[in-house]
Amino acid sequence: CRNGGHFLRILPDGTVDGTKDRSDQHIQLQLSAESIGEVYIKSTETGQFLAMDTDGLLYGSQTPNEECLFLERIEENHYNTYTSKKYAEKNWFVGLKKNGSSKLGP
């Protein structure tokens, strides 16, 4: 979960962003498979699940729901990409901007 040197993190208030700090306790994420190619991404520090809402905004959810399930794909360049399963028709990816803020799905 890196982009431009940023690690994806889920903060206690549900904010999702990126940090360059490797020692930040909120970058520790656990992936768990729901089925082949479908994963939940959970912060081991806050216990929150990564989620994407109807507008493509990333947030942390205390409980897993439809917005927390992502389709995982290994690309030709060997990077993993994650798209919202619920909004798959919109082709929204999990992403960070170069400044570390979360990028809207579209």
UniProtKB/Swiss-Prot annotation:
Keywords: Angiogenesis, Cytoplasm, Developmental protein, Differentiation, Growth factor, Heparin-binding, Mitogen, Nucleus, Phosphoprotein, Secreted. SMART domains: FGF. It is found in: Secreted; Cytoplasm; Cytoplasm, Cell cortex; Cytoplasm, Cytosol. GO terms for cellular component: cell cortex; cytosol; extracellular region; extracellular space; nucleus. GO terms for molecular function: fibroblast growth factor receptor binding; growth factor activity; heparin binding; integrin binding; S100 protein binding. GO terms for biological process: activation of protein kinase B activity; angiogenesis; branch elongation involved in ureteric bud branching; cell differentiation; cellular response to heat; fibroblast growth factor receptor signaling pathway; mesonephric epithelium development; positive regulation of angiogenesis. InterPro entries: Fibroblast_GF_fam (IPR002209), IL1/FGF (IPR008996). Gene3D superfamilies: 2.80.10.50. Heparin binds at T83, S84, K85, K86. The keyword ATP-binding does not apply. In the nucleus, phosphorylated by PKC/PRKCD. Plays an important role in the regulation of cell survival, cell division, angiogenesis, cell differentiation and cell migration. Functions as a potent mitogen in vitro. Acts as a ligand for FGFR1 and integrins. Binds to FGFR1 in the presence of heparin leading to FGFR1 dimerization and activation via sequential autophosphorylation on tyrosine residues which act as docking sites for interacting proteins, leading to the activation of several signaling cascades. Binds to integrin ITGAV:ITGB3. Monomer. Homodimer. Interacts with FGFR1, FGFR2, FGFR3 and FGFR4. Affinity between fibroblast growth factors (FGFs) and their receptors is increased by heparan sulfate glycosaminoglycans that function as coreceptors. Found in a complex with FGFBP1, FGF1 and FGF2. Interacts with FGFBP1. Part of a Cu(2+)-dependent multiprotein aggregate containing FGF1, S100A13 and SYT1. Interacts with SYT1. Interacts with S100A13. Interacts with LRRC59. Interacts with CSNKA, CSNKB and FIBP. While binding with LRRC59, CSNKA and FIBP seem mutually exclusive, CSNKB and FIBP may cooperatively interact with FGF1. Belongs to the heparin-binding growth factors family. This is Fibroblast growth factor 1. It comes from Capreolus capreolus. The gene is FGF1.
